[in-house]
Amino acid sequence: MNKTSDEAVDDDPSVFHCTLELRTEGDWCRGLVRVDEDGRVLFDEWVGTRALIASLLGNTQEPVMTCSCTVPECAGFYDQESRVSENLVHWSLRYEGRDLDLLFDRNAYEDAALAILKHFRSHPWEDAEFGTVPYEYKEFEDFAKLVDNMLASSPRLAEKWNAPQIATRPAGGGS
C-alpha cells in the first residue's frame, strides 16, 4: 500500500488496474469499480460524493468507497486515501484484511466521476431514504453548491463537465 509513483508492480496481487463506472438501478446510483484485465467487478458499492469531488481536485483521506449509510466500515472498507498524479488516480484501502491499491487512468476516472456527479446533480431526489440521494448531504442545495464550487475551481473539469460525452447514464451503467 502507499505506492507513490505512476509505476505499479504488475505481479503484485494487491495492485489492480481499474475503471470506475456509473451504475444505476432504477433511481439508485452507485459506483462500480471494475478490474480492466478480465472485466471482473472488484467492488459494486456506494461511492462517497464528497471524497469523489476531493479526489478530482487532488489528494484526500476521505473514504471514497463506503456504504449507502456513508459509514465505510459498514461495507468493510478501512484506511482509505486517494492520490492523484499526472496520469493516475490511486486509491489505497484495506478490505477484508488485505491492503489494496486501485489504479485508475486519470482521464477515464475523471470522466466516470463526473458522470456520477452529473447524475446526482441532474436528478434531485424525492426520497431521502431510498432514492438517488448522496446521503452525505441534508439538502440537495448543499451537494449542488459543492459541485458548482468544484467546477468553478477547475476550468479543466468544467470543460469536461460541459462536453457532450459526459452523459448522465454512460454506456456500461445499469438499467
Regions found by a protein language model. Give the residues of each.
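Intrinsically disordered, low-complexity acidic regions enriched in Pro/Ser/Thr
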Residues: M1-S175
